[in-house]
Swiss-Prot record:
PTM annotation: O-glycosylated; contains disaccharide galactose-N-acetylgalactosamine attached to threonines.
Lineage: Eukaryota, Metazoa, Chordata, Craniata, Vertebrata
UniProt main location, coarse: secreted
General function of this protein: Antifreeze proteins lower the blood freezing point.
Keywords: Antifreeze protein, Glycoprotein, Secreted
Name of the protein: Ice-structuring glycoprotein 8R
Gene Ontology cellular component terms for the protein in this record: extracellular region
Cell compartments where the protein resides: Secreted
Amino acid sequence: AATAATPATAATPARA
């Protein structure tokens, strides 16, 4: 849901 919304999420391939 918060994908690409947070820089930390975009930095982690597992979350992305």
